[in-house]
């Protein structure tokens, strides 16, 4: 910084970049942090750089799946990035017409998910598209401590929430 005779460092990024920028500021450097994250989870921002682009990509993926899901009467689970926040999944799910949206902020009840799928089938809608945030969690898992949940996931044959959901939906 000083060797290069910089007057200011501009940092683009999410939570980690924001923390690093703040540490550099505390060391006396002039730092500007620009919020760039698809998660849209930085306090004080309405919409971060990258969020709208990520919505478009997720919407395109869900839109492309609609035809296949409808023509083959299937249940599709689309897992959307976002870590522990569901903004991207919510926006993309609503914009693309997902039938069920599961967010990390609202633990889901697998029985209610299955009931919603069965209800759609009874209404003559032979397909269902679920938009699921990667951090979505069941009500049962939400009761576990962080340590217990980590251990459960490490010992699970399901690498992501989508695999877990698919197995549960098939089982029920």
Describe each PLM feature range.
Residues 1-33:
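N-terminal glycine-rich phosphate/adenylate-binding segment common to multiple enzyme folds
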Residues 28-64:
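Glycine/threonine-rich beta-strand-loop-alpha-helix active-site module
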